[in-house]
Amino acid sequence: MANAKGKVTQIIGAVVDVQFDGELPAILNALTTDNNGKKLVLEVAQHLGENSVRTIAMDATEGLVRGQEVTDTGAPISIPVGNATLGRILNVVGEPVDEGEPIVAKETRAIHQPAPEFNDQSTESEVLVTGIKVIDLLAPYAKGGKIGLFGGAGVGKTVLIMELINNIAKVHSGYSVFAGVGERTREGNDLYHEMIESNVIKPDNLEESQVALVYGQMNEPPGARARVALTGLTLAEQFRDQSGTDVLFFVDNIFRFTQAGSEVSALLGRIPSAVGYQPTLATDMGAMQERITSTKNGSITSIQAVYVPADDLTDPAPATTFAHLDATTVLNRAISELGIYPAVDPLDSSSRLMDPQIVGEEHYKVASDVQQILQRYKSLQDIIAILGMDELSEEDKLTVARARKIQRFLSQPFDVAKVFTGSDGVQVSLEDTIASFKAVVAGEYDHLPEGAFYMVGGIDEVIAKAEKMAADAA
């Protein structure tokens, strides 16, 4: 019942109990109250006995007092959608947090929506070229697919997401939505300013911008972090349905969505499941991931960073996410320790598109050969560590030499990492990537030194670097 009035009876951190005299508001309804002049939104999570509901606050509850009046809005949290949100930073309830004008949108949408019906979904498979060699060659991304970047702390997930925004969103003519879920505020601020510098956001003419940002950062209460991914997704769905184009949806970090859900679950008094996660982990993840899909109107290509606690891919949070993805890019600390960036594990990363009928026979064969050489090198590493290179057969020595070149050739300088590397970023076309690796596997460049393959683009750059190294040594 809209506009029904209730009053606060109990406040435990982010959980607020509200008592109503008559009919109770529905589960997931938004309630509003005034907290020292600021509007506070509460979302109904449980119906208790005695005419009470238990709600989750979308902002800090400091200053809230018992007996305070609360109003039922009669609907779930609704946010402004459409072109009015372009170039703006929104919070979980759709309010601008970029110190700009209030957002005046023609349409608002509830953040809780059903997933599209099966007969509305599209099943086409097309490769999305990123310009990053290791991804395009070994675990290609699907247009309108779901992509996960898995990695522990500090192996480069956010840098890789930024580079993908740089490579895809800047040349991509459609719209992008970036949801910052429980990550560092500094990174959110940096991203906003980088987008202004690269003209993706046009502060003088916001309607011409190509991206909308939705932030619920580390300092926010768990209610906001558990819902902000849905806020971003609702914006992306509206752009997909309205424009009928490919919308890019970036989420950094999907693990924080699960983590916030676990905090909320504990506050609601649910009995925890494996490793302390919420018992509804698979349901929460499924409800969100099933909405990220391509329909006959348009598509959403989502790229999600997934933090891996303690580098353990079997942890329930990353393991539940794996099931929903079309392509997984696994970042490995051992590779980043070698100084190879992006630290993508070529043997652990996978893609459903790696099929000769989709990527073509040549691409499939080159990728298989590259992985075979790297796998052989991995199995020889114990022998090398104990007995040394001299004990290997001539054939194995050649395999190791090629594998080390391939390993270094899979590194690449990024535009967004220019401040760290001091060199300009490069993008490599898919044709160039396939031809270059085919030649390396065939042994055409066995005479070039290993160092020439490190942090370059295509094979022409390798040859130029090798000549420069030879000239410097002479």
UniProtKB/Swiss-Prot annotation:
Q: Mind naming one GO cellular-component term on file for this protein?
A: plasma membrane
Q: Does the keyword Cell inner membrane apply?
A: yes
Q: What is its main location?
A: membrane
The EC class name is translocase
The record's CDD domains line, in alphabetical order, gives: ATP-synt_F1_beta_C, ATP-synt_F1_beta_N, F1-ATPase_beta_CD
Q: A Pfam family matched by this chain, by name?
A: ATP-synt_VA_C
Xref: SUPFAM superfamilies: C-terminal domain of alpha and beta subunits of F1 ATP synthase, N-terminal domain of alpha and beta subunits of F1 ATP synthase, P-loop containing nucleoside triphosphate hydrolases
Domain of life of the organism in this record?
Bacteria
Q: What is its EC number?
A: 7.1.2.2
Q: In which compartments does the protein localize?
A: Cell inner membrane
Keyword check for Ion transport, yes or no. Answer: yes
InterPro entries under this entry? AAA+_ATPase, ATP-synt_VA_C, ATP_synth_F1_bsu, ATPase_a/bsu_AS, ATPase_alpha/beta_chains, ATPase_F1/V1/A1_a/bsu_N, ATPase_F1/V1/A1_a/bsu_N_sf, ATPase_F1/V1/A1_a/bsu_nucl-bd
Its keywords, alphabetically, are: ATP synthesis, ATP-binding, Cell inner membrane, Cell membrane, CF(1), Hydrogen ion transport, Ion transport, Membrane, Nucleotide-binding, Translocase, Transport
Q: How does it sit in the membrane?
A: Peripheral membrane protein
Q: Please list the reactions this protein catalyses.
A: ATP + H2O + 4 H(+)(in) = ADP + phosphate + 5 H(+)(out)
Any one GO molecular-function label of the UniProt entry: proton-transporting ATP synthase activity, rotational mechanism
| Positions with a binding annotation for ATP | G151, G152, A153, G154, V155, G156, K157, T158
What is the role of the protein in this entry? Produces ATP from ADP in the presence of a proton gradient across the membrane. The catalytic sites are hosted primarily by the beta subunits.
UniProt xrefs under NCBIfam families: atpD
Q: Which family does it belong to?
A: Belongs to the ATPase alpha/beta chains family.
Subunit record text: F-type ATPases have 2 components, CF(1) - the catalytic core - and CF(0) - the membrane proton channel. CF(1) has five subunits: alpha(3), beta(3), gamma(1), delta(1), epsilon(1). CF(0) has three main subunits: a(1), b(2) and c(9-12). The alpha and beta chains form an alternating ring which encloses part of the gamma chain. CF(1) is attached to CF(0) by a central stalk formed by the gamma and epsilon chains, while a peripheral stalk is formed by the delta and b chains.
Annotated protein name in UniProt: ATP synthase subunit beta
